[in-house]
Regions:
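Acidic metal-phosphate-binding loop of nucleotide-sugar-dependent transferases
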Residues: 62, 87-88
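Conserved donor NDP-sugar-binding/catalytic core segment of glycosyltransferases
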Residues: 88, 92-123
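Glycine-rich, basic loop-to-helix element that forms the pyrophosphate-binding segment
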Residues: 58-75
Length: 151
């Protein structure tokens, strides 16, 4: 199955490269990436241009939900994967997604947040810890940034 990876970005220049590197270094190769710039004013689009992906640029900021929906309109895959620009997937994540959707009883899959901090400076670690604690306690350990829906 082909996976359409939809990544909305808004001034994501600090995290987008790492997100895209993780996707393109995946051991699963049957995918397309659609990056939707939600009227970013930083160099997010220039970063995305370094990868083999489709880039949509919205004329005004309308939020990540609108951007995701625009990405869905361009998707050609059998599986939709909504990935936030600050999410770094594991090398085998796309393979696991594909394998799970081969079971026709599966309609949706949701990712789980990892506690391993991506960035090592003290301020960022504090912010990640604080955010993680509240997101996890409110969502009962579910992480919504990486969510897939079978078309």
């Amino acid at each position: 199955m082909k996976i359409s990876i939809i990544i909305p970005v808004y001034n994501s220049s600090l995290t987008l490269k790492e997100c895209m590197d993780a996707v393109f270094n995946s051991n699963f190769k049957n995918f397309e990436v659609i990056v939707i710039s939600d009227n970013s004013s930083d160099n997010s689009v220039r970063i995305a241009e370094k990868y083999k992906c489709k880039i949509l640029e919205l004329p005004e900021n309308k939020g990540p939900s609108f951007a995701r929906n625009e990405g869905v309109k361009e998707a050609t895959g059998d599986i939709l994967l909504f990935l936030d620009s600050d999410v770094v997937i594991k090398k085998d994540a796309l393979n696991h997604i594909n394998e799970n959707f081969l079971d026709n009883a599966v309609d949706a899959i949701q990712g789980i947040y990892s506690h391993k901090p991506t960035y090592k400076n003290m301020a960022t670690q504090y912010q990640q810890s604080y955010t993680s604690y509240y997101k996890i306690s409110l969502s009962k350990r579910r992480f919504r940034a990486c969510f897939k829906v079978n078309e």
